[in-house]
Amino acid sequence: MRKRKMSKKKKKTIFSMVIILILVIIGGGYFILNNNDLAKKIKEKVEVKKLKIVDQDSKTRPYAVMINNHAKARINHAGLDDAYIVYEAIAEGGLTRLMAIFKDKDTDRIGSVRSSRPYFLDYALENDAIYVHHGWSPQAQSDISTLNVNNINGIQESSNDFWRVKDKKSPHNMFTSTASILKIAERKGYATTSDKKSVLNYIDGDADLKEKYGIVEGQIESTLTEGKAINATKIVIPHSTLQTVEYDYDENSKTYVRYARGKVQTDYITGENIQTKNIIITMCDNYTLADSEEKGRQGLKNIGTFDGYYITDGYAIPIKCEKESRTAQTQYKDLKGNIIEVSDGNTFINICPQDAKIEIE
């Protein structure tokens, strides 16, 4: 039987279909590769936008560590460069004490660690942090119990986890580490994860105060009513007649170098200057507590709405600092009532008296 020859028309049709199929395969491959490249670019873009100072997706519970800021202890500061927030407030004798907040850091030496004061609990609680200290005042001891604060008191712990450095003088030589804090927290059965959001409203990159709020020439008085930014390359904060803190702006690093009573503060392990990207000033009054020991211990009137300043990248704006209760998170707002955006970087929060003569220039 003779095979029928395929017509030219049919051959042409099949050839066309083969060509179309090849083009579809090539086009599909190109589409897939192109989309993979696009997906990769989108992923890279998302990763670039992730904050550097703290992982906001992390559920790790922070640690709040009390840090000695006595004149003889400042030369022993260690680990502050790993803290993403540092609070500073008055203590007895006109001196200040620090509380450093750590999260997702492996810091070998933090200190020098000092005793608790009751109002620092308010800021540990608003961060849902495990509170770390070495000793306590009677008021702090009572409040830790009443408020059910998850705390670690170094006096009650092993010298392997809270240790004194022999070449430094006591009581300014007590140190701990994040590894020790985690070990003790797990032993005590404390939660080591938290769903609480950050106290600060961070943005990716720098908060451009000049662009967002406009700028007004002059000193502090110029910005109090208008809410605009002023130049802020030098900041002086008198916590008391005995304790003045100064920050000088370094344009190269776009951070502020910290000074105490005219001397630059450094990390004694690294030798690096202590610097901060952001400064927040909250102005609320302190008062002397009446107790039988008469040591001049202080209380803080920090519940309510208070004036303050937010400072970053060489500019400052006036803000309102609102705290509704001891456990409530402080809200930092501009004069229009909007939560301020905070630059991606570490922050020192200075809590000073309402009548303090703040200098910003």
Q: Which sequence ranges carry the predicted segments?
A:
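N-terminal Lys/Arg-rich, disordered targeting/topogenic segments
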Residues: M1-T13
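Hydrophobic single-pass membrane-insertion segments
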Residues: G28-I42
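A surface/extracellular/periplasmic glyco- and lipid-processing/surface-interacting theme
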Residues: K10-T13, A39-A83, E92-E361
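Hydrophobic membrane-insertion alpha-helices, especially the h-region
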Residues: S16-G28
